[in-house]
C-alpha cells in the first residue's frame, strides 16, 4: 500500500504516482494547458487563413499545392481527376518581340527553370482524389460519438461533483468540460466535412485533424499512470478507479482512430504522371502506417510475388519530390536577397534547414531515450537481487518501460533516416540539375582567371564545333592538379561527387546525436568515478586532434584519388568515343597501357588511404582500453582510492558506451572530408565563367539583320589565340550568303561569332533575335526571326531519324515530306529498315557521314527559323546529292525568304545562286561582294579548271534540268538496297534496352569475385582472423569476470557478470548505472587491480593490433580484386566487336567504369568485413547464451527465423530496386554526354529549356528506384528494431515469471546477451543485404565479360604467319566476297570480285547504301567474310593475326579523331620518328610551310596581325577529340600520321571532304607523290579528287557495277560513273582531267 501522506507537491513515491500527481498534475494542469494551446492554435489558423483568402487571389498553385474546392466530386466515384479553379494556358507565350531583351532577362528566358513549363505537373488530369470509403466515414462517426459521450460524461461529473468520492471529488472539471467542448466542435466539423465539400472547414479551420490527434494523445498519455494505479489497487474508491480505467480505454480508442486514419483534414490528392504507373500512397497513409513504413508493404509483396520489378512497377514520387518542383523551390529560396551572396553549399544547408530541424527533434528524443533501457535494466536487476525490498508492480513497470523506450528509439531513428533520405534525393536532384544547367551555360573555351585562382577551365569536347579554323585555340592545362572541366570530369561530378554530398546530408543528424551521447556519458562518468573521469576525457581530447590529422591525410589522399578517378574516366571516355580509330590502328594495347597507368596510381592512392585507415582503426580499437586503463590507474595510483567492483564495472560500461559515438563521429568526419572535397569540386565548376552570348550580341529592332560592325573576335585570352580581326560584314537578308576561304582561315569562327560563342574584343555583332525557342510555340509553322544552325560535324541525338529532324517541333506532314525531299533523304528511308523511325544510335552511328549531315541539315531546314547558318554541309555528300541539296534545299522553295549563310569549299557548285560572297583569309575579310564581282577580280579560281567548271555549269544547266526527272527525281527507280552502315532490328531499334538480371545474385557472381579476391584460402584465413579478434574480446570479458570473482567475492555476481558482456559487441545499450559504492577494499588490493589493468590492457592492445591488421588485409585483397576486375573489364571492352559499341550507348559503358567500379573499389571490401564479423559474432553469441541460459535457445531460433523472413522480403525487393537504380543512371550519363557535345547547337536553336527539362525527367526516373530502395531499407530496419524490442521485453517477462528460480547474475547475462544477439543479427542482415546490392555492380561487370570478342584469327585451322616485310607489294584480291552483319540479316556485299594491282590508285564511288564503307571495314576485319576471301599480297587476311593485319594497312577516316595530348603524341604515339620527319609530314599536308619553318618564333610573334601557326610547335596541346582544331585540320593531321607510317595499303574515306579545293588539289598531289609506292583506295564524293586515279570501282546495292580506268568509263555515256560526273556539273573538267591521266598512263606503260 502506498503511503498517501506525502508532500503536497510530490509526484512519485516508491513504486507509483502520488494522489497529487494524479489529481493536480495529470487531471487539472494537463487539460488546462491543452485548452489554452488549442484555442491559440485554432485562432491563429483562423486569422491566418482568413487574411490569406481575403488578400490572395484565388489562383491555383499547381506545382506544389492543390485546392480541394476545385475538385468535382461524385459519390459514386472512387477516384476522380482534378479540376482547377482557373485553367491557365501554360503553352501560350507572348510574342518574343514583346518580351524584355535585356541581357539578364534574356539569360533567364533561356536558362531559368522557373520559366520551364512544368508539363504534366500542371496537367489537372494527372491528379486524383482518394475518397473516404464507408469504413473511414464510420471511424469519423465513431470518433464523434465517443467525443460527445466524453463531453456529456464530464458535464455530468461536473454537475454531480459534490456527490462524488475519492479522487473525483477533488477534480476541477471545468477545464475538462471546456477541453471536450473544443474537441466536440472539431469532431463535428470533421463529420460535416466527410465529403470534402464544406468550404468553411476547408478555408478557415486549419489542420483540425492534427489538433484533435495531439489532444487525444496527450490525454491518453496523462491517463496511463492513473490507469496503472487503478490496476495495482492504489486508487481507493470504486468510482475513481472506474473513471481512470474508462478514460484510459476511451482515449486509447480515440487516439487509435486518428492514428490509423489518413493524416490531415483534406482528402489526399495524388499525383499520377503516367497512367501505367501507380501514384505514391505516401500522401494518404496514416500516422501509424507512416511510422512503421507499412505503406510500402504492397510494393514489397509485389516484388516478392514476381521475384522481379520493372521500372513501370515503381510508384511515382510525391509531387514535392519531383526535381522540377525541387529546383523551382530551391531557386526561389536562393534568389532571396539574404542568400544571393552565399556559396552553393551554404545555400543547400539553409534550404533544407526545416527538414534538418525535424531531424534534430527526433534525434534529441532518441539520444536521451537510448539510456533508458540500460538504466531500467540496472533497476530491474537491483529488484531481483533484493526481492524483499522491492515491488513486483514496479518491476513490471521497468519491463514495459524498456520496451516502450526501445520502441520510441526505433521510431525516432527511422524517421530521422527517412527524412535524411528525402533530403538526399532532393539534394542530389539539385546538384545534378545545377551541374547540367551550368554545362549548358559555360563558355566552350577557357577564359583568363584572376591570379589567385588555380583552376583552369578547359574546353569540353564539342564534335559539332570546329572552334578554330586555324592553328591554335585553347591550351589544355598540363598541371595535373588543376581542375579540368571536360566531359569525363563533369560526368564524374554528377555520378560520384553529387552522390557523396547528398549521402552525407542524409546522416548529418548523427553529429547532434553523438554530441548528446558523449555529453551524457561523460556526465554519468563523473558522477560514478569522480575526478578520475577527467583523465579519460583528457585522453579523448588528445586523441581527437591526432585522429583529425589522420583524417586530413585521408582527405588529401581522397582528393588525389578522385583526381585520378577523373583522369581515368576522361581517358576511358575518350577511348570509347574513338574506338573505331583505335581499332583501325590496332592501338588497343597502347590505350589500355595509358589507362592502366592512371588506374595504378588510383589504386596506389587507395592503398595508401587504406593504410592510414588502418592506423585510424587501431586508434578506434585501442581508445576505450586506453581510456579505461589510464582512468583506473589515476584513481588507484594517484588518488589512492579503493576501486570497488560496482564503480569499476559501471565505469567500464560507460567507457564501452563511448566507443559507439566515437566510432560514429570518426565515420562521419571521414564522410565529411570526402563530401567537402566533392563540394569544393562542384563549387569550382559552378563558378566557371558562363557564355557572354547575351551580353555581346545586339538584337536588331526589325528582327532581320545579321552583321558585323568593326568586330574583333578571339577564342580566348591567350596571346596566341586565333583572332578574327576587323570584320565589317552586312549579310543580305532573305538571300544566300556564301563564306569561302582556305582551310583554317576562320570560316567556322565567323559562324561561331554570330552565335556568340567567341569572345568579343571590340565592335558590334547584330543578330535578328535572341529569344528562346519555346517562346515561338504559339507561332508553330510560321517562319520567325530565330536562328538555326547546322554544324560541320553533324551532331545528332540518340533517337529516331524523325525526332532528330523535328527536334521537338510540331509535326507537319506536308512540311516534313518537303524537307525530306529537299535533303535527299527519301531513298535513305528506304534503306533503313524502319524508315524514319529507325534509331540512329549514339552520334548517329547507324548512318553514313553523308546521311548524318543531311539529317542535321533537315533539322535546320524544318525549323521555323528565318536565318540558317550552314557549316560546310555539302562536304560529306556525293556530287549528285550535293547538287540536289543545293538546288532543292539551299536554293529551293523551303529557303525562300530565309537568310542562309553557307560555309563551303565547293565554290563551283555554290556560286550559281549565291547573292553575296565573303572570302576569308587568316581571320580577315579578304574580299566581299557578289559572285560576279569576285570572279572579275580572279578570286574564285586562279587556274583554268576552276574557270571552266563555272562555265561548264552554266552550259550544262539546261541538260541538268532536263535530266532532273531521271536522276534527281523525287521517286528514284526501284533498286535493291543494302545496308552500308551499322544494322538495326526490324523495328528500327538499334540501342538495346539495358539488361537487368532477375532474382538473387547468382553463386557464380560470388565465386568469380572470390576468385579475384584471392580464392577460398584467403576467405578462410580472413575468417580465422575475425575469429581470433572475437576470441580476444571474449577473453577480455572473462578476464574481468574471473578477476572480479577472485578479488571481490563479497560482491554479488550480478554486479560483475552483467557488464562482462558489454565487450562482446560494441553496443550503445549496455550501460549499468550504480549509485551505491561497494564495500571498501584494503589498499593492498590495489596491486591486484594494477595487475588486472595490465593484463586487461595487453589483451586490448592485441585485439586492436589484430583488428587493424584485419582491416589492412581485407583492404589489400579488395584492391587486388578491383585491379583484376578492372583489367579484365577493360580488356574485354576494348577488344569487343564494333557492333557492341554501335548498340550500347557510351554512357551505359561508362556507368560500368565509374559507379560500378567505385562500388567494387570502396564499398564491397567493407561489406565483406562486416558480414564476416557479424556472422561469426552471431554464432559465438548464440553459443554463449545457450551455455549460460539454455532456455533462451528456442527463442533465439524463433528470432533467427523472424529475421530471416524479414530479411528475405527485404532482399528480394532491394536487390531489384538496386538494379533499377543502376540501370536508370545510364540515360542520365548518356544525355549529359550528348548535351555537352552539342551545347553549341542547343544554344544556337535557343532550346536550352527543353534539354534542362529532359534532364530533370531523367533525374526523376533515377530518383524513383533510389528513394524507394531506402524506404524499403527503413521498412527492414524498423521491423528488426521492433523484434529487438520484443526480445528485450520477452526476456524481461521470462525473468519475472521465473524470479524465484533465477539469480541476478544469470538474469543480467541472459538479458544483456539477448540484446547483444539482437543487434548482431540486425547488423548481419543489413550488411548482407548491402553486400548483395553492391554485388549487383560485380554482376553488371561480369555481364560484360561475356560480350563477343574480335577473333585474332578468323580461321585458326589455316593460320599463317606472314613474313616480317609483309605486305611488300600491296596487291589486293577480293574473290567472291559476301558479307552480312548477322546470320539472320541479308547480305550487304554480294559475291564481289575485283583485283587491285600493286601500287594502283583506286577510287571507290557509289550512292549511299552501295556498300563502299562495308568493303573498307571488311579489309580491317570489322566484318568477317561469310563466303569468299580477301587476300593481301596473296595472304588470306582471315588467316593472319588481327593486330598484324591492322598495323600493316592504314586508313584516314571521314570523321578524323585526335586524342588529348600534343601534336607529337597524336602523330607519333610510339615515338618512332624524329622531329624532322614529323615536320616533313606536316609540310606535305600543308599544315606548315617552308617559310614558316625558316622564320624565327620572334619574327612570327612580332607580326601581331597574323595568327600563330601552332603546328610549328610539336608540343602544342590538343584538346580531347581535337576540338581545338577545325575539321579540316584534323583530317590533315590524320593524313600526316599516315604519311609517317607509309604503309603498302592505305585507305582514304572522304579524307579531304572538309578541305578547300586548292588544298585538296595539293593534298591529292601529295598522295600521288608520297604514296607512289603504296596501293591507295579512296572513297570520295569529290570526283575531281579521284578522276585521275588508275581505276574507279563503282558499287551499287552491294555489287561491283563498274571497274575500269575513269576515262574508259567516261567514254561510255551510259555508265553509272558518267552519270555521276554529269550530275556533278563538272563533266567537261572531269573528262579533261581523266583524259590527261589516261594519256599519261599510256605513255608511262609504253616506256616500260
UniProtKB/Swiss-Prot annotation:
Induction: Azole exposure induces expression via regulation by the transcription factor PDR1 that stimulates gene expression via binding to elements called pleiotropic drug response elements (PDREs). Expression is highly up-regulated azole-resistant isolates.
InterPro entries: AAA+_ATPase, ABC1_TM_dom, ABC1_TM_sf, ABC_transporter-like_ATP-bd, ABC_transporter-like_CS, ABC_transporter_C-like, P-loop_NTPase
One Gene Ontology cellular component: fungal-type vacuole membrane
SUPFAM superfamilies, alphabetized: ABC transporter transmembrane region (SSF90123), P-loop containing nucleoside triphosphate hydrolases (SSF52540)
Coiled coil: none
Keyword list, A-Z: ATP-binding, Glycoprotein, Membrane, Nucleotide-binding, Repeat, Transmembrane, Transmembrane helix, Transport
SMART domains linked: AAA (SM00382)
Gene3D superfamilies assigned to the protein according to its UniProt record, in alphabetical order: ABC transporter type 1, transmembrane domain, P-loop containing nucleotide triphosphate hydrolases
Localization per record: Membrane
TM stretches of this protein: 28-48, 140-160, 175-195, 207-227, 250-270, 352-372, 392-412, 501-521, 523-543, 612-632, 643-662, 1012-1032, 1089-1109, 1168-1188, 1191-1211, 1282-1302, 1305-1325
Main location: membrane
Pfam families named among the record's database cross-references: ABC_membrane (PF00664), ABC_tran (PF00005)
Molecular function (Gene Ontology), one example: ABC-type transporter activity
GO biological process, alphabetically ordered: response to metal ion; xenobiotic detoxification by transmembrane export across the plasma membrane
Chain positions carrying an annotated carbohydrate: 72, 306, 471, 573, 710, 784, 798, 1042, 1255, 1376, 1503, 1524, 1573
Residues in ABC transmembrane type-1 domain copies: 361-674, 1032-1333
Domain ABC transporter: from-to ranges: 706-947, 1372-1622
Topology of this chain in the membrane: Multi-pass membrane protein
Positions that bind ATP: 741-748, 1406-1413
Family as reported in the entry's similarity comment: Belongs to the ABC transporter superfamily. ABCC family. Conjugate transporter (TC 3.A.1.208) subfamily.
Function: Pleiotropic ABC efflux transporter that might be involved in the resistance to azoles such as fluconazole.
Protein name according to UniProt: Pleiotropic ABC efflux transporter of multiple drugs YBT1
Gene name linked to the record: YBT1
Amino acid at each position: 500500500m502506498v503511503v498517501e501522506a506525502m508532500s503536497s507537491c510530490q509526484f512519485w513515491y516508491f513504486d507509483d504516482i502520488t494522489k497529487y500527481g494524479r489529481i493536480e498534475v495529470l487531471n487539472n494542469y494537463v487539460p488546462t494547458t491543452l485548452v489554452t494551446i488549442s484555442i491559440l492554435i485554432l485562432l491563429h489558423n483562423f486569422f491566418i487563413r482568413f487574411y490569406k483568402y481575403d488578400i490572395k487571389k484565388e489562383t491555383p498553385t499547381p506545382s506544389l499545392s492543390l485546392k480541394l474546392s476545385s475538385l468535382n466530386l461524385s459519390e459514386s466515384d472512387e477516384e476522380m481527376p482534378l479540376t482547377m479553379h482557373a485553367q491557365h494556358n501554360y503553352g501560350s507565350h507572348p510574342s518574343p518581340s514583346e518580351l524584355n531583351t535585356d541581357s539578364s532577362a534574356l539569360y533567364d528566358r533561356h536558362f531559368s527553370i522557373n520559366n520551364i513549363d512544368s508539363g504534366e505537373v500542371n496537367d489537372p488530369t494527372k491528379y486524383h482524389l482518394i475518397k473516404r470509403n464507408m469504413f473511414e466515414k464510420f471511424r469519423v462517426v465513431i470518433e464523434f460519438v465517443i467525443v460527445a459521450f466524453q463531453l456529456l460524461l464530464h458535464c455530468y461529473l461536473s454537475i454531480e461533483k459534490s456527490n462524488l468520492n475519492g479522487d473525483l471529488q477533488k477534480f476541477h472539471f471545468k477545464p475538462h468540460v471546456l477541453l471536450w467542448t473544443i474537441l466536440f466542435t472539431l469532431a463535428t466539423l470533421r463529420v460535416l466535412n466527410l465529403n470534402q465539400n464544406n468550404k468553411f472547414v476547408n478555408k478557415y479551420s486549419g489542420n483540425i485533424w492534427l489538433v484533435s490527434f495531439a489532444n487525444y494523445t496527450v490525454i491518453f498519455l496523462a491517463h496511463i499512470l492513473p490507469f496503472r494505479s487503478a490496476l495495482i489497487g492504489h486508487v481507493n474508491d470504486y468510482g475513481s478507479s472506474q473513471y481512470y480505467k474508462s478514460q484510459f480505454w476511451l482515449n486509447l480508442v480515440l487516439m487509435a482512430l486518428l492514428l490509423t486514419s489518413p493524416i490531415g483534414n483534406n482528402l489526399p490528392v495524388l499525383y499520377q504522371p503516367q497512367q501505367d504507373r501507380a501514384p505514391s500512397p505516401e500522401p494518404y497513409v496514416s500516422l501509424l502506417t507512416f511510422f512503421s513504413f507499412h505503406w510500402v508493404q504492397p510494393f514489397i509483396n509485389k516484388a516478392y510475388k514476381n521475384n522481379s520489378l520493372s521500372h513501370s512497377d515503381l510508384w511515382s514520387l510525391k509531387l514535392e519530390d519531383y526535381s522540377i518542383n525541387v529546383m523551382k523551390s530551391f531557386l526561389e529560396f536562393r534568389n532571396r536577397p539574404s542568400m544571393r551572396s552565399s556559396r552553393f553549399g551554404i545555400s543547400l544547408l539553409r534550404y533544407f534547414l526545416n527538414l534538418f530541424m525535424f531531424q534534430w527533434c527526433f534525434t534529441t528524443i532518441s539520444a536521451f531515450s537510448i539510456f533508458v533501457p540500460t538504466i531500467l535494466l540496472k533497476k530491474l536487476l537491483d529488484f531481483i537481487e533484493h526481492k524483499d525490498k522491492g515491488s513486483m508492480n514496479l518491476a513490471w513497470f521497468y519491463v514495459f518501460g524498456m520496451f516502450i523506450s526501445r520502441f520510441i528509439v526505433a521510431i525516432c531513428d527511422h524517421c530521422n533516416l527517412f527524412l535524411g533520405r528525402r533530403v538526399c534525393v532532393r539534394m542530389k536532384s539539385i546538384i545534378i540539375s545545377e551541374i547540367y544547367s551550368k554545362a549548358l551555360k559555360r563558355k566552350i573555351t577557357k577564359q583568363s582567371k584572376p591570379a589567385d585562382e588555380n583552376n583552369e577551365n578547359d574546353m569540353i569536347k564539342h564534335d559539332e564545333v570546329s572552334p578554330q579554323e586555324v592553328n591554335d585555340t585553347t591550351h589544355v592545362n598540363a598541371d595535373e592538379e588543376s581542375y579540368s572541366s571536360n566531359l569525363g570530369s563533369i560526368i564524374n561530378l554528377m555520378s560520384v561527387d553529387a552522390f557523396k554530398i547528398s549521402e552525407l546530408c542524409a546522416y548529418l543528424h548523427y553529429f547532434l546525436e553523438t554530441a548528446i551521447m558523449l555529453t551524457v556519458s561523460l556526465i554519468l562518468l563523473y558522477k560514478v568515478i569522480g575526478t578520475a573521469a577527467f583523465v579519460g576525457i583528457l585522453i579523448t581530447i588528445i586523441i581527437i586532434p591526432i585522429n583529425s590529422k589522420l583524417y586530413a591525410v585521408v582527405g588529401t589522399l581522397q582528393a588525389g584519388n578522385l583526381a585520378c578517378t577523373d583522369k581515368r574516366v576522361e581517358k576511358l571516355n575518350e577511348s570509347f568515343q574513338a574506338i573505331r580509330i583505335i581499332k583501325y590502328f590496332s592501338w588497343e594495347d597502347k590505350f589500355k597501357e595509358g589507362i592502366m597507368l592512371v588506374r595504378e596510381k588510383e589504386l596506389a592512392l587507395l592503398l595508401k588511404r587504406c593504410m592510414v585507415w588502418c592506423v585510424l582503426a587501431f586508434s578506434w580499437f585501442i581508445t576505450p582500453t586506453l581510456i579505461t586503463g589510464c582512468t583506473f590507474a589515476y584513481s588507484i595510483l594517484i588518488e589512492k582510492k579503493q576501486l570497488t567492483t560496482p564503480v569499476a564495472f559501471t565505469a567500464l560500461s560507460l567507457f564501452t558506451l563511448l566507443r559507439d559515438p566515437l566510432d560514429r563521429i570518426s565515420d562521419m568526419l571521414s564522410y565529411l572530408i570526402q563530401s567537402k572535397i566533392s563540394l569544393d569540386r562542384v563549387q569550382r565548376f559552378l563558378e566557371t565563367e558562363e557564355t557572354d552570348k547575351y551580353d555581346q550580341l545586339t538584337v536588331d529592332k526589325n528582327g532581320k539583320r545579321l552583321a558585323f560592325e568593326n568586330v574583333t573576335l578571339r577564342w580566348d585570352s591567350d596571346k596566341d589565340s586565333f583572332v578574327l580581326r576587323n570584320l565589317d560584314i552586312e549579310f543580305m537578308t532573305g538571300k544566300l550568303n556564301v563564306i569561302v576561304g582556305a582551310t583554317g582561315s576562320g570560316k567556322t569562327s565567323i559562324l561561331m561569332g554570330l552565335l556568340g560563342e567567341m569572345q568579343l574584343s571590340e565592335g558590334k555583332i547584330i543578330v535578328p533575335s535572341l529569344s528562346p525557342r519555346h517562346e515561338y510555340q504559339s507561332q508553330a509553322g510560321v517562319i520567325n526571326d530565330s536562328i538555326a544552325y547546322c554544324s560541320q560535324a553533324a551532331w545528332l541525338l540518340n533517337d529516331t531519324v524523325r525526332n532528330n529532324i523535328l527536334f521537338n517541333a510540331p509535326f507537319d506532314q506536308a512540311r516534313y515530306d518537303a524537307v525530306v525531299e529537299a535533303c535527299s533523304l527519301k531513298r535513305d528511308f528506304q534503306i533503313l529498315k524502319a524508315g524514319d523511325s529507325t534509331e540512329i544510335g549514339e552520334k548517329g552511328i547507324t548512318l553514313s557521314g553523308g546521311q548524318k549531315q543531311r539529317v542535321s541539315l533537315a533539322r535546320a531546314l524544318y525549323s521555323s527559323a528565318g536565318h540558317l547558318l550552314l557549316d560546310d554541309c555539302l562536304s560529306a555528300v556525293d556530287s549528285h546529292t550535293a547538287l540536289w541539296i543545293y538546288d532543292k534545299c539551299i536554293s529551293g522553295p523551303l529557303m525562300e525568304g530565309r537568310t542562309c549563310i553557307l560555309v563551303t569549299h565547293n565554290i563551283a557548285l555554290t556560286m550559281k545562286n549565291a547573292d553575296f560572297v565573303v572570302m576569308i583569309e587568316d581571320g580577315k575579310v579578304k574580299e566581299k561582294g557578289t559572285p560576279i564581282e569576285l570572279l572579275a577580280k580572279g578570286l574564285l579560281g586562279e587556274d583554268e579548271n576552276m574557270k571552266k567548271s563555272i562555265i561548264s555549269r552554266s552550259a550544262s544547266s539546261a541538260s541538268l534540268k532536263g535530266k532532273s526527272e531521271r536522276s534527281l527525281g523525287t521517286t528514284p527507280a526501284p533498286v535493291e538496297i543494302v545496308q552500308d552502315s551499322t544494322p538495326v532490328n526490324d523495328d528500327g531499334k538499334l540501342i538495346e534496352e539495358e539488361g537487368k538480371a532477375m532474382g538473387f545474385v547468382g553463386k557464380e557472381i560470388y565465386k568469380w569475385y572470390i576468385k579475384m579476391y584471392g580464392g577460398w584460402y584467403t576467405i578462410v584465413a580472413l575468417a580465422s582472423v575475425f575469429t581470433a579478434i572475437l576470441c580476444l574480446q571474449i577473453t577480455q570479458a572473462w578476464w574481468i569476470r574471473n578477476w572480479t570473482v577472485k578479488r571481490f567475492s563479497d560482491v554479488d555476481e550480478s554486479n560483475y557478470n552483467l557488464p562482462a558482456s558489454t565487450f562482446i559487441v560494441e553496443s550503445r545499450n549496455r550501460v549499468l548505472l550504480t549509485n551505491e559504492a561497494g564495500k571498501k577494499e584494503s589498499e593492498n588490493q590495489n596491486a591486484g587491480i594494477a595487475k588486472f589493468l595490465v593484463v586487461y590492457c595487453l589483451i586490448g592492445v592485441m585485439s586492436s593490433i589484430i583488428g587493424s591488421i584485419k582491416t589492412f588485409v581485407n583492404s589489400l585483397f579488395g584492391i587486388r580484386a578491383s585491379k583484376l576486375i578492372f583489367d579484365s573489364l577493360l580488356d574485354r571492352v576494348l577488344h569487343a566487336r564494333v557492333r557492341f559499341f554501335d548498340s550500347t550507348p557510351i554512357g551505359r559503358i561508362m556507368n560500368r567504369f565509374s559507379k560500378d567500379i567505385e562500388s567494387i573499389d570502396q564499398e564491397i571490401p567493407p561489406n565483406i568485413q562486416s558480414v564476416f564479423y557479424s556472422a561469426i559474432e552471431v554464432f559465438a553469441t548464440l553459443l554463449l547464451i545457450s551455455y549460460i541460459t539454455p532456455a533462451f535457445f528456442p527463442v533465439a531460433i524463433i528470432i533467427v527465423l523472424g529475421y530471416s523472413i524479414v530479411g528475405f522480403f527485404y532482399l528480394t525487393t532491394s536487390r531489384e530496386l538496386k538494379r533499377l537504380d543502376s540501370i536508370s543512371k545510364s540515360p542520365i550519363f548518356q544525355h549529359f554526354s550528348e548535351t555537352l557535345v552539342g551545347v553549341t547547337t542547343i544554344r544556337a536553336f535557343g532550346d536550352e529549356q527543353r534539354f534542362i527539362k529532359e534532364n530533370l525527367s531523367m533525374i526523376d526516373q533515377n530518383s524513383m528506384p533510389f528513394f524507394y530502395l531506402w524506404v524499403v531499407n527503413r521498412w527492414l530496419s524498423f521491423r528488426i528494431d521492433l523484434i529487438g524490442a520484443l526480445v528485450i521485453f520477452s526476456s524481461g517477462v521470462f525473468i519475472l515469471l521465473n524470479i524465484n528460480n533465477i539469480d541476478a547474475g544469470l538474469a543480467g547475462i541472459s538479458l544483456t546477451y539477448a540484446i547483444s544477439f539482437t543487434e548482431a543479427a540486425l547488423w548481419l542482415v543489413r550488411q548482407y543485404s548491402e553486400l548483395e546490392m553492391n554485388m549487383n555492380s560485380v554482376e553488371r561487370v561480369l555481364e560484360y565479360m561475356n560480350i563477343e570478342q574480335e577473333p585474332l584469327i578468323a580461321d585458326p585451322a589455316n593460320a599463317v604467319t606472314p613474313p616480317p616485310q609483309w605486305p611488300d607489294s600491296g596487291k589486293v584480291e577480293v574473290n567472291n566476297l559476301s558479307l552480312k552483319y548477322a546470320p539472320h540479316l541479308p547480305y550487304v556485299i554480294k559475291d564481289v570480285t575485283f583485283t587491285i594491282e600493286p601500287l594502283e590508285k583506286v577510287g571507290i564511288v557509289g550512292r549511299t547504301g552501295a556498300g563502299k564503307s562495308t568493303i573498307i571495314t571488311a579489309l580491317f576485319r570489322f566484318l568477317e567474310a561469310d563466303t569468299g576471301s580477301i587476300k593481301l599480297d596473296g595472304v588470306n587476311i582471315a588467316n593472319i593475326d588481327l593486330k598484324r593485319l591492322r598495323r600493316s594497312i592504314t586508313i584516314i577516316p571521314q570523321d578524323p579523331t585526335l586524342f588529348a595530348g600534343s601534336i607529337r603524341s597524336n602523330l607519333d604515339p610510339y615515338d618512332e620518328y624524329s622531329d624532322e620527319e614529323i615536320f616533313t609530314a606536316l609540310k606535305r599536308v600543308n599544315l606548315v610551310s617552308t617559310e614558316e619553318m625558316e622564320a624565327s618564333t620572334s619574327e612570327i610573334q612580332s607580326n601581331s596581325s597574323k595568327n600563330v601557326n601552332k603546328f610549328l610547335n610539336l608540343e602544342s596541346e590538343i584538346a580531347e577529340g581535337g576540338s581545338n582544331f577545325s575539321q579540316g585540320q584534323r583530317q590533315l593531321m590524320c593524313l600526316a600520321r599516315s604519311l609517317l607510317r607509309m604503309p603498302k595499303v592505305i585507305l582514304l574515306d572522304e579524307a579531304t571532304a572538309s578541305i578547300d579545293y586548292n588544298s585538296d588539289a595539293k593534298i591529292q598531289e601529295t598522295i600521288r607523290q608520297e604514296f607512289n609506292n603504296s596501293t591507295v583506295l579512296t572513297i570520295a564524293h569529290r570526283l575531281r579528287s579521284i578522276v585521275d586515279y588508275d581505276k574507279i570501282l563503282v558499287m551499287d546495292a552491294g555489287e561491283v557495277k563498274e571497274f575500269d580506268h575513269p576515262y574508259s568509263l567516261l567514254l561510255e555515256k551510259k555508265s553509272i560513273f558518267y552519270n555521276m560526273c554529269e550530275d556533278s556539273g563538272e563533266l567537261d573538267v572531269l573528262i579533261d582531267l581523266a583524259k590527261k591521266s589516261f594519256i599519261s598512263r599510256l605513255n608511262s606503260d609504253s616506256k616500260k
